[in-house]
Amino acid sequence: MAAPGSARRPLLLLLLLLLLGLMHCASAAMFMVKNGNGTACIMANFSAAFSVNYDTKSGPKNMTFDLPSDATVVLNRSSCGKENTSDPSLVIAFGRGHTLTLNFTRNATRYSVQLMSFVYNLSDTHLFPNASSKEIKTVESITDIRADIDKKYRCVSGTQVHMNNVTVTLHDATIQAYLSNSSFSRGETRCEQDRPSPTTAPPAPPSPSPSPVPKSPSVDKYNVSGTNGTCLLASMGLQLNLTYERKDNTTVTRLLNINPNKTSASGSCGAHLVTLELHSEGTTVLLFQFGMNASSSRFFLQGIQLNTILPDARDPAFKAANGSLRALQATVGNSYKCNAEEHVRVTKAFSVNIFKVWVQAFKVEGGQFGSVEECLLDENSMLIPIAVGGALAGLVLIVLIAYLVGRKRSHAGYQTI
């Protein structure tokens, strides 16, 4: 008779194999893009989880799934990029027409995954059962995945990227672009999520009286240049409008001005994306992204991303991003100008107030602003005095006509003696 323990061994072995299989499905995978010489220029090792909200005939539904182990790099769509022409990109395909794309860019000191996009096919009944639409959807967003040049980006914690109704979470991520030797660098830039939490501060003193509303921010000039010259000119004053929960559980809204005297600017020039990155007072990073619509030949503010520290907040690290904006639009080669204050809503909790903006992206001739395209707010403000002036002129004319008619009638009433 077999020993009692020996009967359990096949069952335990089967359970172990199933567990290893499940772990394998969720394990990190390596993706690589090589140039024509066979040298890797992009390496990425991560696992990814997707959360997608979509519509069914019975109502909204949420589907979560992992990047499968058989996901592959799309070689004919991935690229090491060409200087001043195109940026590096990694395109990963899986399932029935689903792709995850990481678009990279760099400046003199740092590189980043500037834009992440996800294309998903709702006709895939395995991932999206009972979907009311069979369309192929595309979503995209800027990210805070960035690292120093010649260092790898490392993030063991989950890195979330929100794209409208889709959230992509990268786990145990090691990513590096602009490689020269087909291997990850020893040096690394760690994500904020992996950094040690700050020491717990003592209880905050009683809240002071509300601080006064700051005056309008100072206007400063910014420019971004590449090897082909200037790709961005901007003159503007910037004010952050933040809503957050404080440590005492109260919700406050604060206005913070960007002080040009305590701000450094950098950026990058790409064929389809231009960025302006502002570092202010050692606690705030504000990123602007300008895109271009090739069919209409117009540029626009496409994305804004903010990372800042709010000492009195329950969560001092404040982050917000939106890569689907359509603001500050003008024809490529022209400049966009608005003297009126503009409010650009990024998220429910964050917006940017822009004062006296004058901006031009992509095509900048001779480092000077091109022909001006006025904003609607300025055009309306010009129409108001014209309308008021016209109304006053009409009123004066009516009074004058009434006076002349009255005078004529009074003369007609006299009799000659």
UniProtKB/Swiss-Prot annotation:
InterPro entries: Lamp2-like_luminal, Lamp2-like_TM, LAMP_CS, Lysosome-assoc_membr_glycop. Residues 199-215 have a biased composition (Pro residues). Residues 228-382 are annotated as: Second lumenal domain. Residues 1-28 form the signal peptide. O- and N-glycosylated; some of the 18 N-linked glycans are polylactosaminoglycans. (Microbial infection) The glycosylation of Asn-76 is essential for Lassa virus entry into cells. GO terms for biological process: establishment of protein localization to organelle; Golgi to lysosome transport; granzyme-mediated programmed cell death signaling pathway; lysosomal lumen acidification; positive regulation of natural killer cell degranulation; positive regulation of natural killer cell mediated cytotoxicity; protein stabilization; regulation of organelle transport along microtubule. This is Lysosome-associated membrane glycoprotein 1. It is a single-pass type I membrane protein. Residues 29-194 are annotated as: First lumenal domain. The chain crosses the membrane at residues 383-410. Disulfide bonds join C41-C80, C155-C191, C231-C269, C338-C375. The keyword Cell membrane applies.
